[in-house]
Structure formats: C-alpha cells, structure tokens
A protein has these predicted regions:
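Hinge/lid segment of periplasmic solute-binding proteins
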Residues: 97-153, 179, 206-210, 293-295, ...
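A structural signal for short loop-to-beta-strand junctions that line the ligand-binding cleft
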Residues: 82, 91, 121-160, 193, ...
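Long, aromatic- and glycine/proline-rich binding clefts that accommodate carbohydrate-like moieties
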Residues: 295, 348-408, 412, 440-443
Length: 443
C-alpha cells in the first residue's frame, strides 16, 4: 500500500515538474531566469502569493519567480521530495512546520544560511522573533526561510458575551475562567456551547504543553536528536485532556473535528469561543457576521509557568539540483521577503505574522495595533517569554502521521470510548513505533 501511494505521488511530482518547471504561460518573460516556487495556498492567500511574486519580478529585470499550487501542505511536501528524487525539484517549496525534521534529514535541501553566504547577501537574522528563528534553526543556523507564520489564539463572540451579561471587552484568561464563562453562556441561553477548537493536536496538545512549559517528546522535543517517544501521557497531558473530555459531556466544550472543521461552529454562533490559528484573523474580519475579539490562550495557572506558544504555518525551503545563476535569483527573492516593509505589507494583507522586530516596530509606530487590536494578541503571546527547551518548538520525524495518531485518540476520548489516560497512552505507544522507525532510517 505504501509503495502504491508513493508511486502515485512520484508520478504526480513528475507531472508537476514537467508543467511547472518546463512550460510557462505566455506572459512569463522568456529572457528572465525562472525561479519555480511550489506553494500550498488557495483562495485569497494564493492571490497574495502571486502578488508577492509579481512585486519581486517588477523590482528587477533578471529573475522571474513563478508560483505553482502543488496541493495541500502534506501533498506539496510529498510531491517536492518525490520530484527531488526524480531530479526535477522546484527551486523553492512551501512546507508546513511539522515537515521540518523530514526536510532537515532529506538530503534534498540547500540551507538558507548557506545560500545567503554563498551569494554574499547579509540578512540580520537576529532581528527575527525568537520562536520563529528557533523553530527553523539547527545549531544556530537558519535552514529555511520563515514565510507564513501563525500561532493559536482564542476568538470570542462579543454579542454572545453581552447577552450572557459577560464583559464583551474581556476574554477569559485561565481555563477556570473558560469553564465559568461557558457555564454563564449556557445558563443565559446565549450559545449552545461554550467553546470549540481547531487543529486539535496543534492547539490542545502541542501548544498546551509549550504554553505550560511541559515536555512534549524526548530529546527536548527532538531538538537534541531524533526523538523516539512522546511525553504527552504525563500528569499535565492527562489533566488537560481529561478536563476537555469532562467538559464535552457538560456541553461546555464541543469537539468540532480536525483542521478547520470547527470554523462554522464558531461563525454560526453555536460555540461562543474558538481556539484556532491567528492566521484566520484576516478572514474573520471579512466574513464573521458578529463582533468578535481575541485573547491569549487560556492557562491553568500554578504550578505551571506561563511560557510562549508555538509557531505554526510554513517556511520556504530551497531545493538542491539547480544552477548557480538560478540560486542567485532565489537568494535575491528571499532577501526581498525579509525586508521589513515587505513583512509589514504581508501581515496587513494576510493576517500572518510579521516576523522581524523592525517590521513590528514599523507597525507599532504607525499605530496599527491600536487600530486593529486583535492583531496584537498573537505577537504578545509569542514574545511574552524567551523560548525554553520545552517551548521553542517540536521537531519530529513523520510528524504528520503522529498528529493523525494523536487526533484519532483524542476523538476516542471525547466520544467517551477511552479515558484520557488510556487514549494518551495508546497515542504514545503508536507514535513510538513511528518515531523509532523514522530514527532507524536515518541512523
């Protein structure tokens, strides 16, 4: 079965390579050196990607960046690695954060720090915010270019809060307040459910461990070597997931599905609070039918310290196998993306985080966060504390598969089929087999 699936991706990668790398719309200028970028965004975000490329292309006369939609995040990662094995990789590929370890060990990438050194382009990476820089660096060197960065935050329905007699300007700050606010909302009939979440493993397991400075996996979450075991079935993990399961039975919490399946539950007013990616702010500003606000992730309080949340989204990886003059164009494009003015514009347009301090300073000087206060929540949460070995990120092999394992066990727990301890124990056991198999491949 695995061979069949891989063969399908291999053939698709070859097709994308032949279309994306060797054939171009007539509008592409033939005299320019092409830089082929496989990306994973659709809709308005794809339009923003196209606009970025057009801006760079108009800024100079030598290179032509050519974005190409290669599928979902997981599809794009698989296709890019298959294309690399077929010796037809793109120059750039957008890979989500859970693919970091796979890319690092693939042998298919040209590290960004090395690319910039080779082309004598200086970027002060120290100005990038610490959680972003630490997630994608190895031994202090940046391996991929941070691009669309986000972190989970809490959204809440101000109308529902008002109907329940709650202060619409004050979101809950602790999990105890989430429970109390939800109970008030239910009793007042202001909403049928208190809160829901998106991307359950990312928001409720990965980020909750980091937010409370708890270890997620061995080897300092994989940063000190190949992790071979998750640590999510300890006292903290069982406490948190067990409480979610109890709240599910009391209608305080409603499990809404994986990824963005719960969006409609919040947007239709069924759940008054929603923990989801900060990347949705722009979309909610355009389409949410009621007034809403944002708050930091709820915290359990003592004895757990409040740390920083984890970064999400994706970075741009440079692939091996191209000519020197083409890499010069790649380096110039990444330099273009790193400019503070470009970071500021990207944040304003998409809602993704501006990831350098100069860009943040420019936004603050312009009064942007006073005008759009919901946009500050994610920045404040990410930068409130220096990352620790437990909160700088998670670097696991086959992380996509591990997330699927965790979320399947969460679903069994929330359905009442297993206790939190049973489900998390099984998630650890199954993921251990995946991690050990991955480690064996790269030893």
């Amino acid at each position: 079965m695995r061979c069949t699936v891989y063969a399908r991706w291999f053939l698709w990668a070859l097709l994308l390579s032949s279309l994306g790398l060797h054939a171009g719309p007539p509008a592409w200028a033939a005299e320019k050196t092409g830089v082929h970028w496989w990306q994973a965004m659709r809709g308005q975000l794809e339009d923003a990607v196209e606009e970025l490329a057009q801006q760079f292309n108009a800024s100079q006369s030598t290179y032509e960046v050519r974005p190409w939609y290669a599928g979902t995040y997981a599809e794009t990662l698989t296709a890019a690695l298959a294309a690399s094995q077929a010796h037809h990789p793109p120059h750039l590929v957008q890979v989500f954060e859970v693919g970091t370890q796979t890319m690092l060990l693939s042998g298919a990438v040209y590290p960004v720090y090395q690319l910039m050194q080779d082309h004598h382009i200086a970027i002060d990476w120290s100005t990038f915010i610490a959680p972003v820089l630490s997630y994608y660096s190895k031994q202090g060197r940046l391996y991929s270019m941070p691009f669309n960065a986000s972190t989970p935050i809490l959204y809440y329905n101000k109308d529902a809060f008002g109907r329940a007699g709650l202060d619409p300007t004050r979101p809950p700050r602790t999990w105890q307040e989430v429970e109390a606010f939800s109970t008030t909302l239910l009793r007042a009939g202001a909403a049928p459910c208190g809160f829901t979440v998106g991307w359950p493993s990312w928001t409720m397991v990965e980020n909750m461990h980091a937010w409370h400075n708890q270890p997620f996996a061995t080897k300092y979450n994989g940063f000190a070597g190949l992790a071979t075991k998750l640590l999510i079935n300890g006292a903290f993990g069982v406490k948190h997931i067990g409480q979610l399961a109890a709240w599910q039975q009391a209608h305080i919490f409603r499990y809404g599905g994986r990824e963005r399946a719960a969006d409609s539950t919040f947007l239709q007013g069924e759940c008054a609070m929603y923990i989801q990616s900060s990347a949705l702010i722009g979309e909610f500003m355009r389409h949410c039918p009621f007034p809403w606000g944002t708050g930091e992730l709820p915290h359990w309080g003592a004895p757990y310290p409040k740390q920083n949340s984890l970064i999400g989204g994706a970075t741009l990886w440079v692939m091996q196998g191209h000519r020197l003059e083409e890499y010069a164009g790649v380096a110039q494009f990444l330099q273009f993306l790193a400019r503070p003015a470009q970071q500021e514009a990207w944040h304003r347009q998409t809602g993704y985080l501006a990831i350098s301090q100069p860009a943040l300073d420019a936004l603050q000087t312009a009064g942007y966060f006073q005008q759009v206060p919901v946009q500050w929540t994610a920045f404040g949460q990410l930068t409130r504390a220096a990352p620790t070995v437990h909160s700088r990120g998670i670097r696991l092999g086959d992380f996509v598969q591990i997330r699927d394992i965790i979320e399947a066990e969460l679903e069994a727990i929330f359905a009442g089929q297993k206790t939190a301890q049973q489900g998390l124990d099984e998630a650890v056991d199954m993921s251990t087999a995946v991690l050990q198999a991955f480690a064996a491949r790269y030893r």
